[in-house]
């Protein structure tokens, strides 16, 4: 279910203020954030934001296509290591 339109999109105030100060100063350095639920705003385009995935910060370069999405969508939290082990090998050998 999406967020109510009367509430507007959520963005961490501290993150947005840091992006705006970097825009005023023409800086382009990575910003570390734990706010995965923040919506990407047009002011963030062109910046690299290091989003925390639970273990480390994943650098995400923000493009125009990402505006309106959440930061957490671009930093996966789970790593898929494949299905099965010995069972999968045995099934393949029997056929």
From Swiss-Prot:
Belongs to the universal ribosomal protein uS19 family. GO terms for biological process: ribosomal small subunit assembly; translation. It holds the Pfam family Ribosomal_S19. One of its GO terms (cellular component) is small ribosomal subunit. PANTHER family: RIBOSOMAL PROTEIN S19P FAMILY MEMBER, SMALL RIBOSOMAL SUBUNIT PROTEIN US19M. Protein S19 forms a complex with S13 that binds strongly to the 16S ribosomal RNA. HAMAP family: Ribosomal_uS19. It comes from Herpetosiphon aurantiacus (strain ATCC 23779 / DSM 785 / 114-95). It comes from the Bacteria. Residues 80-95 have a biased composition (Basic residues). One of its GO terms (molecular function) is structural constituent of ribosome. Residues 76-95 are annotated as: Disordered. Keywords: Ribonucleoprotein, Ribosomal protein, RNA-binding, rRNA-binding. This is Small ribosomal subunit protein uS19. The keyword Ribosomal protein applies.
